């Protein structure tokens, strides 16, 4: 049997077909690899171009001449501003075309060109990082329902702090000035700081918390500067509440003393008095101070106009102790039949913090015996333990608040 010429050619073609298919697949892999390399190189090129642009901008900034920093005294007209530059003096300068005259306000920091003294940039206010850290970013989750036995104090602080912030028009209608500040005083553990947290939660204001000891600084003038910057920050974030805990550390009565440390503390208090007189109550800045030694505070700090209301926090009575017990035992796993009133009767003279400590100690007794519930006996043993600590306290402090 003989094959024709056409059949022979088709047989040869069928033999080369797998070879060409393999070759095409190899070339496709090479093309895909080259394309991937090209995309990678393009990404690297874009990244390098971005770095080049950034370095060019940085080089341009480095080549720019330095600017004078001044403070605006007042705008003169649409194109002129009176600026104070230390130590040269005051100058009337022109505005750069990029600066809006409406953004230029008195006491703001500005940058002036080195040669022409043209105002070309508005700078942010200078605030110490230690002062900026005093601002509480997260609003405390304490509420008035978590404060037991202080109904009268809650009503008074609402009138002084919460009402002016939320409804200032009521004071305008009556024609009376808004209160500036309030002093919370009483023995330790009676709920002063807890109530301040609740006020911050309900007013939805910027809450700035500072301890009096933080304002006592090593170098002369540092404490006064921190007080000034504290109120500057409060104005910028108004409405705001400044809570000063342990105010007796800087607000004690002034005495004749040759000590440099005492003089610096007195200067800090004088700056605080100046700020309390200087800022207007209508700016929605309220001051809450707390202390457990009102007897040593300076009379100048306590006068009306600076501290408009003084709220006493006495030790809780039996009903108040019962309310505090109910609040702190609300989430505890208690056995049935626990008589909380009897437990409150066993703690005469106890503070709110000690009542909370009784609940914690009762839970610890239950844990010690591997139980998941708290009994009446646990509470009674906790009362005995906590009140025993109370009886060993310094008698002079107890005598002070008798």
Swiss-Prot record:
The record, for InterPro entries, names: 26S_Proteasome_ATPase, AAA+_ATPase, AAA_lid_3, ATPase_AAA_core, ATPase_AAA_CS, NA-bd_OB-fold, P-loop_NTPase, Prot_ATP_ID_OB_2nd
Q: Which UniProt keywords apply?
A: ATP-binding, Cytoplasm, Nucleotide-binding, Nucleus, Proteasome
* One Pfam match: AAA
* One GO cellular component term: nucleus
- Report the domain of life of the source organism: Eukaryota
> What is this protein's function per UniProt?
The 26S proteasome is involved in the ATP-dependent degradation of ubiquitinated proteins. The regulatory (or ATPase) complex confers ATP dependency and substrate specificity to the 26S complex.
Record-given protein name: 26S proteasome regulatory subunit 8
- The source organism is Manduca sexta
């Amino acid at each position: 049997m003989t094959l024709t010429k056409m059949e022979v050619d088709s047989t040869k073609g069928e033999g080369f077909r797998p070879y060409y298919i393999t070759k095409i697949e190899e070339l496709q892999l090479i093309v895909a690899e080259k394309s991937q390399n090209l995309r990678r190189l393009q990404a690297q090129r874009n990244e390098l171009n971005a770095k080049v642009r950034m370095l060019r901008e940085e080089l341009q900034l480095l080549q720019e001449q330095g600017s004078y920093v001044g403070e605006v005294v007042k705008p003169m007209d649409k194109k002129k501003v009176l600026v104070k530059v230390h130590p040269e003096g005051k100058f009337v300068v022109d505005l750069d075309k990029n600066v809006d005259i409406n953004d230029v306000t008195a006491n703001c920091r500005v940058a002036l060109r080195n040669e022409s003294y043209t105002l070309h940039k508005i700078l942010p206010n200078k605030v110490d990082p230690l002062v900026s850290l005093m601002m509480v970013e997260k609003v405390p989750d304490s509420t008035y329902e978590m404060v037991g036995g202080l109904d009268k104090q809650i009503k008074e602080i609402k009138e002084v702090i919460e009402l002016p912030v939320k409804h200032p028009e009521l004071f305008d209608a009556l024609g009376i000035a808004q209160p500036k500040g309030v002093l919370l005083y009483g023995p330790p553990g009676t709920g002063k700081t807890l109530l301040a947290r609740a006020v911050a939660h309900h007013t939805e204001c910027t809450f700035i918390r500072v301890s009096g000891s933080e304002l006592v600084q090593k170098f002369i003038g540092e404490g006064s500067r921190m007080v000034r910057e504290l109120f500057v920050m409060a104005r910028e974030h108004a409405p705001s509440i400044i809570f000063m805990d342990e105010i007796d550390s800087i607000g004690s009565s002034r005495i004749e003393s040759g000590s440099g440390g005492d003089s610096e503390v007195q200067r800090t208090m004088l700056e605080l008095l100046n700020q309390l007189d200087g800022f207007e109550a209508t700016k929605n800045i309220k001051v809450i101070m707390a202390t457990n030694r009102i007897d040593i505070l300076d009379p100048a700090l306590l006068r009306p106009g600076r501290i408009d209301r003084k709220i006493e926090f006495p030790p809780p009575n039996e009903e108040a102790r019962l309310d505090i017990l109910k609040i702190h035992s609300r989430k505890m796993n208690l056995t049935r039949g626990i008589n909380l009133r009897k437990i409150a009767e066993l703690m005469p003279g106890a503070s709110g913090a000690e009542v909370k400590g009784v609940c914690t100690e009762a839970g610890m007794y239950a844990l010690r015996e591997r139980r998941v519930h708290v009994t009446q006996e646990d509470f009674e043993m906790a009362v005995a333990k906590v009140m025993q600590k109370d009886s060993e306290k310094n008698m002079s402090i107890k005598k002070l608040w008798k």
